Swiss-Prot record:
The keyword 4Fe-4S applies. GO terms for molecular function: 4 iron, 4 sulfur cluster binding; metal ion binding; phosphorylase kinase regulator activity; tRNA binding; tRNA uridine(34) acetyltransferase activity. Component of the elongator complex. Interacts with transcriptional repressors snai1 and snai2; interaction with snai1 inhibits snai1 ubiquitination and promotes snai1 stability. Residues 84-374 form the Radical SAM core domain. It comes from Xenopus laevis. The keyword tRNA processing applies. PANTHER family: ELONGATOR COMPLEX PROTEIN 3 (PTHR11135:SF0), HISTONE ACETYLTRANSFERASE-RELATED (PTHR11135). Pathway: tRNA modification; 5-methoxycarbonylmethyl-2-thiouridine-tRNA biosynthesis. It catalyses: uridine(34) in tRNA + acetyl-CoA + S-adenosyl-L-methionine + H2O = 5-(carboxymethyl)uridine(34) in tRNA + 5'-deoxyadenosine + L-methionine + CoA + 2 H(+). Binds 1 [4Fe-4S] cluster. The cluster is coordinated with 3 cysteines and an exchangeable S-adenosyl-L-methionine. This is Elongator complex protein 3. One of its GO terms (cellular component) is nucleus. It comes from the Eukaryota.
């Protein structure tokens, strides 16, 4: 029924909006019962016009108004940005308070390309951020309070129709480990408390309650520098429940690291990778093509070196092409003509060639920074660089075989393909002084990845007492596909179908029969420890361990 003009005249905008939302839901239910596909944007536009509204109803309001009996059916279809939880986990990025970069003390300045920080043009921003990225703006709104940042983001994802049973934190905002210990403890304690609802007095208490929380913290990622990734830093991060490190590498060339004022050597990068992997961490590196004194050939050479040389070989990579932003040393070089960025098409070519080099055990998390385009004076001109690079790869006849491209959840969203014939595939390689085994369940015909496990035979130099004397460690276990609440089984989703258990059994066999290890350890997120307890593991220090004899 279309309301007549008289009726509309007597109604407030809020009442008309309520009727519009109810009408949209009614049409969605009818479409579902008739088995039809609906274009939500067209439906919203048409229904808003019918009620004489100038604005469309927000997706959050539509999701909130769905009746209980239709929630299971409609909410997954309405979900905004399904990629957010396609890998099986809701990622919550939080920022620590702004602080100066630690290497100012001995190099006299920050890196030449770094835009943010307390002394920069961008007030309230943290080091290496502008304050205008979505995460930065959420952090500033919450006045950098970790508890509020977490609660607000989890609520926001819930309202957008995402399942937030499993949360992974990313701690951003400069070198977290350079901050005072009491602030770091306060910050991590509040992250765990925001999920469990408990108010803790110490990190260990927060972690204990977080283990039993309904919303599980399945991992914490901390951004750091190679010189803040030493034994004491790694031990602290293990106590926090951290499972992954993002290490700023930027370049594998010593002269470029020196000229851009990084404040550490490339040797320090290799050492930090070695220590981190021997402690069980997953290592993600930040790399910056198009730095000063590079050039196209040298850029391609550095990525060949990065993936081929066993001293590097990270588990993941964030690719951040250099951006020129006002107030930086690089901006001065660019203004005086001493630095030139690649042209947009050259950059797309370069990224396409880099993605073709990525081995199947590495995950490319990002291909550009989240910095708003108006702040960029020179550098990336496209907001969808990964898509353009993948399209260029199609033209060149190459393909990207990194973990993210092949994930089952992402494949389903982008290409509507589902795995058919699933096999266990094993890849062995040497990295950072240790024997690495990458186990995965894949559909080799369609090249779709369902689950993966990273197993490492710890080297002799392992510094953790729990990992000394012939121990193997599982550094990652992840079954992809949309988030399934931890206690339920959904036959159409790939999480909780037993793939994780099969991967663990194979890892235990390799550790016992091939590595000759007497014990296997797992670096487990705080919220997933009970999963390992069920299969015979117990807590020893920060690790879940099991004897193999």
């Amino acid at each position: 029924m279309k309301p007549d003009r008289g009726m509309r005249g007597n109604m407030s905008q809020a009442e008309l909006m309520m009727m519009t939302v109810a009408d949209v839901i009614k049409q969605l239910v009818e479409a579902h019962e008739q088995g039809k596909d609906v274009n939500l944007n067209k439906l919203k536009t048409k229904t808003s016009a019918k009620y004489g509204l100038s604005a469309q109803p927000r997706l959050v309001d539509i999701i909130a108004a769905v009746p209980p009996q239709y929630r299971k059916i409609l909410v997954p279809k309405l979900k905004a940005k399904p990629i957010r939880t396609a890998s099986g986990i809701a990622v919550v990025a939080v920022m620590c308070k702004p602080h100066r970069c630690p290497h100012i003390n001995f190099t006299g300045n920050i890196c030449v390309y770094c835009p943010g920080g307390p002394d920069s043009d961008f007030e309230y921003s943290t080091q290496s951020y502008t304050g205008y990225e979505p995460t930065s703006m959420r952090a500033i709104r919450a006045r950098y309070d970790p508890y509020l940042q977490t609660r607000h983001r989890v609520e926001q994802l819930k309202q957008l129709g995402h399942n937030v049973d499993k949360v992974e934190f990313i701690v951003m905002g400069g070198t977290f480990m350079a901050l005072p210990e009491d602030y770091r403890d306060f910050f991590i304690r509040n992250l765990h408390d925001a999920l469990s609802g408990h108010t803790s007095n110490s990190v260990s208490e927060a972690v204990r309650y977080s283990e039993r929380s309904n919303t599980k913290c399945v991992g914490i990622t901390i951004e750091t520098r190679p010189d803040y990734c030493l034994k004491r830093h790694l031990s602290d991060m293990l106590c926090y429940g951290c499972t992954r490190l993002e290490i700023g590498v930027q370049s594998v060339y010593e002269d470029v690291a020196r000229d851009t004022n990084r404040g550490h050597t490339v040797k320090a990068v290799c050492e930090s990778f070695h220590l981190s992997k021997d402690a069980g961490f997953k290592v993600v590196s930040h790399m910056m093509p198009d730095l000063p004194n590079m050039g196209l050939e040298r850029d391609i050479e550095q990525f060949i070196e990065f993936f081929e040389n066993p001293a590097f070989r990270p588990d993941g990579m964030k690719l951040y092409p250099t951006l020129v932003i006002r107030g930086t040393g690089l901006y001065e070089l660019w203004k005086t003509g001493r630095y030139r960025s690649y042209s947009p098409s050259t950059l797309v070519d370069l990224v396409a060639r880099i993605l073709a080099l990525v081995p199947p055990w590495t995950r490319v998390y990002r291909v550009q920074r989240d910095i708003p385009m108006p702040l960029v004076s020179s550098g990336v001109e496209h907001g969808n660089l990964r898509e353009l690079a993948l399209a260029r790869m199609k033209d060149l006849g190459t393909e990207c075989r990194d973990v993210r491209t092949r994930e089952v959840g992402i494949q389903e969203i982008h290409h509507k393909v589902r795995p058919y014939q699933v096999e266990l595939i094993r890849r062995d390689y040497v990295a950072n002084g240790g024997w690495e085994t990458f186990l995965s369940y894949e559909d080799p015909e369609q090249d779709i990845l369902i689950g993966l496990l990273r197993l490492r035979k710890c080297s002799e130099e392992s510094f953790r007492p729990e990992l000394k004397g012939g121990v193997s460690i599982v550094r990652e276990l992840h079954v992809y596909g949309s988030v399934v609440p931890i206690s339920s089984r959904d036959p159409s989703k790939f999480q909780h179908q037993g793939f994780g258990m099969l991967l663990m059994e194979e890892a235990e066999r390799i550790a016992r029969d091939e590595h000759g290890s007497w014990k296997i350890a797992v670096i487990s997120g705080v919220g997933t420890r009970n999963y390992y307890r069920k299969i015979g593991y117990e807590l020893e220090g920060p690790y879940m361990v099991k004897r193999l004899d």
